[in-house]
């Protein structure tokens, strides 16, 4: 087995820093999430997409989780503009894509159309409730979409995360240099606690390497900030993982909280990065109680292994069992739940913010120390600026 073939067969490259911008007069302002999508399209992370979806592909993705050519794609990647802006631009024109006064790309406008946002919400997020963070963002966006291929002309400033940003072409090269033929991807927006460590190491028993690929794009306000999480990942890998079997790189996309649909999307993107396998745990990309615990695993049954092109690895909820004296899951542990050390993410965040160290059976002490220090420093800065 060798590294996965990019989704759709070819790794898309829409990067052209020499693109002639001088003649372009029209421009479209991007949101932070759209800017991330622009860069991920341009570097091939979203292969086979070459731009923001036109109406036919948009409708197909929303309704069938496929592009019009049949390729699996579960999340609509769209560019929204106001009705006023839509009147200023036309199909056939090329517009600059701007963020905070800087031009990051251009779009060859093929189509300007009005989406059915309620339908998009119900099919992609399984709800149209505005308290769902993904749905709320959807309805906060303007009501007109612009579709067409893009060209990426400028890269975003990666700041302190710069050493951990890798385009798909780079990760593929690194994996090959490490001698890895099989690579398992792990997506997270949370710190890695013992349960995550356990399933990652279970997966590492059957593949050559682990690609730990935390999301550092937009998340919910109560999620642990990315800079603090990154420090916690580094201390965990330094102390508890074999250095030649793990690769840490960030994923700059915004979190959609689309549960099952987002699990498919996350798998396809990791396939483009070179992964042959992808870990899907309980309630992947979920929020609240909108999705069933294992819906994100069941959704993979809608597709054949050939059209996915990446092997999903499904894991049950894991925990430390005081009776087993080790990490386990309901598949391997026969004991009553009273022997299981289980803490909710909300409870853990509360403990960390209060300076309380979660039990070592739940979180590595080095990781907890980094999280407590980071959160308390952030709280102190926030308090001083009020």
UniProtKB/Swiss-Prot annotation:
It is an enzyme of class 2 (transferase). It comes from the Bacteria. This is Sulfate adenylyltransferase. CDD domains: ATPS (cd00517). The keyword Kinase does not apply. It comes from Geobacillus sp. (strain WCH70). Keywords: ATP-binding, Nucleotide-binding, Nucleotidyltransferase, Transferase. The keyword Nucleotide-binding applies. Belongs to the sulfate adenylyltransferase family. Its EC number is 2.7.7.4. PANTHER family: PTHR43509, SULFATE ADENYLYLTRANSFERASE (PTHR43509:SF1). Signal peptide: none annotated. It catalyses: sulfate + ATP + H(+) = adenosine 5'-phosphosulfate + diphosphate. GO terms for molecular function: ATP binding; sulfate adenylyltransferase (ATP) activity. One of its GO terms (biological process) is hydrogen sulfide biosynthetic process. Pathway: Sulfur metabolism; hydrogen sulfide biosynthesis; sulfite from sulfate: step 1/3.
């Amino acid at each position: 087995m060798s590294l996965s073939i990019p989704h759709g067969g070819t790794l898309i490259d829409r990067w052209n820093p020499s693109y002639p911008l001088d003649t372009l007069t029209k421009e479209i302002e991007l949101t932070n999430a759209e800017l991330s999508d622009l860069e991920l399209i341009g570097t091939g992370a979203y292969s086979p997409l070459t731009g923001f979806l036109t109406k036919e592909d948009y409708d197909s993705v929303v309704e069938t989780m496929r592009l019009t050519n049949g390729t699996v794609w579960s999340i609509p990647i769209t560019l929204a503009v106001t009705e006023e802006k839509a009147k200023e631009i036309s199909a056939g024109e090329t517009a600059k894509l701007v963020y905070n006064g800087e031009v990051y790309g251009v779009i060859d406008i093929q189509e300007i159309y009005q989406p059915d946002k309620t339908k998009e919400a119900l099919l992609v997020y399984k709800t149209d409730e505005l308290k769902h963070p993904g749905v709320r963002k959807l309805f906060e966006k303007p009501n007109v979409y612009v579709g067409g291929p893009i060209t990426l002309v400028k890269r975003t400033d990666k700041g302190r995360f710069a050493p951990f940003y890798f385009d798909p072409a780079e990760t593929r090269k690194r994996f090959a240099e490490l001698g890895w033929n099989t690579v398992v991807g792990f997506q997270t927006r949370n710190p890695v606690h013992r349960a995550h460590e356990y399933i990652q190491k279970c997966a590492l028993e059957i593949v050559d390497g682990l690609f730990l690929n935390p999301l550092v794009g937009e998340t919910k306000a109560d999620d642990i900030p990315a800079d603090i999480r990154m420090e916690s990942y580094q201390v965990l890998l330094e102390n508890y993982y074999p250095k030649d079997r793990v690769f840490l790189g960030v994923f700059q996309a915004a979190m959609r909280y689309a549960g099952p649909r987002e699990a498919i999307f996350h798998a396809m993107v990791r396939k483009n990065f070179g992964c042959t396998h992808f870990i899907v745990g309980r309630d992947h990309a979920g929020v609240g109680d909108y999705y069933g615990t294992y819906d994100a695993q069941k959704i993979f049954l809608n597709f054949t292994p050939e059209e996915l092109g990446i092997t999903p690895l499904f894991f049950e909820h894991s925990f430390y069992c005081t009776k087993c004296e080790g990490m386990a899951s309901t598949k391997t542990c026969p004991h009553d739940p009273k022997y299981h050390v289980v803490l909710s993410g909300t409870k853990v965040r509360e403990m960390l913010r209060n300076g309380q160290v979660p039990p070592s059976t739940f979180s590595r002490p080095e990781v907890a120390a980094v999280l407590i220090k980071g959160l308390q420093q952030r709280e102190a800065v926030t308090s001083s600026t009020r």
